[in-house]
Amino acid sequence: MKYTHEQLEKHSEILAQKVFLTDRLPHFELLLSEVKILAEQSETGSTVVSLERGLLYGGYSLIGPYFHQHNFISVDSSPTSADERGAYNKSKVLDDDFIQVPITTRAPIENTVLDDNIADLVLVPNLVHHIADQHALINEMSRITKPNGKVFVFEPTLRELHQIPDDYLRYTPYGMYEIMRKVGLEPIDTKLNGGPFSAIGYCWLQALEYLPLEQRKETEAWFFNEHWPQLKQWDTQHTQNLVREHTKFPVGFSILAEKIK
């Protein structure tokens, strides 16, 4: 099924406002913008594989609608341990403007049952840190990608422990470069998102969740009305560490790599 520009824009609004809360969680602005760019740039009819976690959203692919002009295959890599938590985020997508694209299949990352060299583009959106077997994941990313095909990875550098116990590690872009290159994936474009001031805001948001409800409401209003706008402004104004060289403080990053073997 094909969707209109208006439908996709409304879907994007749901993701931004209800799912990713991009006004408060700056990590995911980068993810949404890059996915939409990749959808626009990918050749119509090309094969796009998304390795993601759809169980918690009721079995839907959040990014599937953007690839409605492609041969889109989504693989839910949620482990069996996630079954107990179930679709606990489904309420966030219960909206008429959310485009429901069901996950194609659910399979462990060690055995996705996809053919070798099937994908022109492989998407790994916010998944890497939820996979216990990193060796299997990185090899699968390479195995299913066609020679000269592309692999897109989005990962946070700053996150609380979440979806416990299925939260295993945090990469830097440079660590991701190393493991990608070992399986023939050469990074060709990297983007960083956020800075030290949005990191402060993110930590505040996490801390507020530990307060009792009434105190939380009062403190949230104080923080987001009086301080959050200033922190976001500083993040765009002050982008270089003036004390230490070779230092950055992103809250997330994306890498686009090409399969060279």
Regions found by a protein language model. Name each.
Residues T47-N111:
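Class I SAM-dependent methyltransferase SAM/SAH-binding core
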Residues H135-P147:
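A short glycine-rich, Lys/Arg-flanked "PGG" loop and its adjoining helix->strand segment in the class I
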Residues L185-P196:
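Conserved S-adenosyl-L-methionine
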Residues M1-T44:
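Class I SAM-dependent methyltransferase Rossmann-like catalytic core
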Residues L123:
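A conserved beta-strand element that flanks and buttresses the S-adenosyl-L-methionine
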Residues R159-K182, P196-A199:
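Acceptor-substrate binding/catalytic loop of class I
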Residues G149-E155:
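Conserved beta-strand signature within the Rossmann-like core of class I S-adenosyl-L-methionine
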Residues S198-K261:
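A C-terminal cap/extension of S-adenosyl-L-methionine-dependent methyltransferases
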